[in-house]
């Protein structure tokens, strides 16, 4: 019998509609898989088994009557950054200990409207600040991938490490995630999954716990390009409750899968060839170029001259916004409260105990760059750099380029508590060097599994598209996926 947890969203959807499979059977299979794997991989921080079975039973009832949404009966994992009504929502931080919101985020409400089933809340870096899922209050997520002939525990990437690892390990059919500087695309690349960061404004941010409001964007992680296209169709919408939400029609992304890319122009930015970059990454990039050429695309060398300034500018803009957003967590209204002799001491006690080290670091950086005397020198200058980064992309796309192809990450996944990365914050931040410019410009970007490293770990390529042209990068990503083949981790934890 087919292992139900290996079905893609498209396969499960078709089987459910034909009544060859029940939503309750599919959900139960995932809950059993989670029960077995979660003590080892630590992907879920809350498992909503009872609620999942009730949602699945309702899906079966609708399907039996010939009704049902585009995700009817599909079991999903939800990143712990999305508010889920009366269910654990803590951004994997101690400061939100015990918080259960009385409202639903717009993104998750859209998924439930379309019939999806919630399996639980997924682990992540605390407040989405991290690139390895090691900053979570609930401990690190263990990647389902291992190097050849090694038992070393690897990171799944971050901040959406739980989402990527759960999809890769077969612990949900797909997952929600968020991307502020690469938090969908980097973990997708590290785990052999597909992850898309949509254009800023495509998915509502309402009910999603904020990190950096001008950069945060929700998106899906799935097993393949088609699954991500199906998920994004549901997640994306205009929302009056989010002032940055854009009122544009949401295309049928799935209909673009399999269409020809003949005649499309693909830009290759020279600035992404970094000094000392792994030859494996360069070789993978060249393979991607060749695959697109063979599919009829035209390759065009381009320049994005301000790319090298994007990462340092990001680490001024993002912490500045984070320091402002996280000021609301004071122990007064919700979450953790550590008493003190007066209200000031209560604030200090709560925030010093409630926030982890990486979050504290970014709050301090943000407070510093926004302080009097440094605002002009750092924050305003970083915003000017951001404008230049965006202008580079605009000029490239206005010259006729349809999409840009780059590596997704400079290396494959590294070890948990890797000493070199652990003792060098900048080395950790450099994991996002290829992804951050996309956020700074507000563009859509997708990571597609494209090969394996010499030690058997997944490597990804990134496609960057024009604003609100996610369908084009889905179309091109599918070509890469078909050429590269599919990659899956061996289930060493069973």
Curated annotation (Swiss-Prot):
PROSITE patterns: AMIDASES (PS00571). It holds the Pfam family Amidase. The keyword Transferase does not apply. Its EC number is 6.3.5.7. Belongs to the amidase family. GatA subfamily. Heterotrimer of A, B and C subunits. Allows the formation of correctly charged Gln-tRNA(Gln) through the transamidation of misacylated Glu-tRNA(Gln) in organisms which lack glutaminyl-tRNA synthetase. The reaction takes place in the presence of glutamine and ATP through an activated gamma-phospho-Glu-tRNA(Gln). This is Glutamyl-tRNA(Gln) amidotransferase subunit A. It comes from Bartonella henselae (strain ATCC 49882 / DSM 28221 / CCUG 30454 / Houston 1) (Rochalimaea henselae). The gene is gatA.
């Amino acid at each position: 019998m087919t292992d139900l947890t290996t079905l893609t969203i498209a396969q499960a959807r078709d089987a459910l509609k034909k009544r060859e499979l029940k939503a309750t059977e599919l959900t139960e299979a995932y809950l059993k898989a989670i029960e077995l794997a979660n003590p080892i991989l630590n992907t879920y921080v809350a498992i909503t088994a009872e609620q999942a079975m009730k949602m699945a039973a309702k899906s079966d009832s609708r399907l039996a009557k010939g009704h049902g949404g585009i995700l009817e009966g599909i079991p999903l994992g939800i990143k712990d950054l999305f508010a889920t009504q009366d269910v654990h929502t803590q951004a994997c931080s101690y400061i939100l200990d015990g918080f259960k919101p009385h409202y639903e985020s717009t993104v998750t409400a859209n998924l439930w409207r379309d019939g999806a089933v919630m399996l639980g809340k997924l682990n992540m870096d605390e407040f989405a600040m991290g690139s390895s899922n090691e900053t979570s209050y609930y401990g690190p997520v263990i990647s389902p991938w291992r190097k050849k002939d090694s038992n070393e525990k690897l990171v799944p990437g971050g901040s959406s490490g739980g989402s990527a690892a759960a999809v890769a390990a077969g612990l949900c059919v797909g997952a929600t995630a968020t991307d502020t500087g690469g938090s969908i695309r980097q973990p997708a690349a590290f785990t052999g999954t597909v992850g898309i960061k949509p254009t800023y404004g495509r998915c509502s941010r309402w009910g999603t716990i904020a990190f950096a409001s001008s950069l945060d964007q929700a998106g899906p992680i799935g097993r393949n390009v088609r699954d991500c296209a199906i998920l994004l169709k549901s997640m994306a919408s205009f929302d009056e409750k989010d002032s940055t939400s854009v009122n544009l029609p949401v295309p049928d992304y799935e209909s673009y899968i399999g269409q020809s890319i003949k005649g499309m122009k693909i830009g290759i930015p020279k600035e992404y060839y970094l000094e000392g970059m792994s030859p494996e990454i360069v070789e993978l990039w060249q393979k991607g170029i060749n695959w697109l050429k063979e599919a009829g695309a035209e390759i065009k060398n381009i320049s994005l001259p301000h790319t090298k300034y994007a990462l340092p500018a990001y680490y001024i803009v993002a912490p500045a916004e984070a320091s402002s957003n996280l000021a609301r967590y004071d122990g007064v209204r919700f979450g953790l409260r550590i008493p003190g002799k007066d209200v000031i001491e209560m604030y200090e006690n709560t925030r010093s105990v409630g926030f982890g080290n990486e979050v504290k670091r970014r709050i301090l950086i943000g407070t510093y760059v926004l302080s009097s005397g440094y605002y002009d020198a750092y924050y305003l200058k970083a915003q000017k750099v951001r404008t230049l980064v965006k202008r580079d992309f605009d000029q490239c796309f206005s010259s006729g380029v349809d999409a840009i192809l780059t590596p997704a990450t400079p290396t494959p996944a590294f070890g948990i508590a890797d000493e070199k990365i652990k003792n060098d914050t900048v080395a950790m931040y450099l994991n996002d060097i290829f992804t951050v410019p996309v956020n700074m410009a507000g563009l859509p970007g997708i990571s597609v599994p494209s090969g394996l490293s010499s030690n058997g770990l997944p490597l990804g390529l990134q496609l960057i598209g024009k604003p609100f042209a996610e369908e084009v990068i889905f179309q091109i990503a599918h070509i890469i996926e078909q050429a590269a083949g599919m990659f899956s981790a061996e289930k060493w934890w069973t």
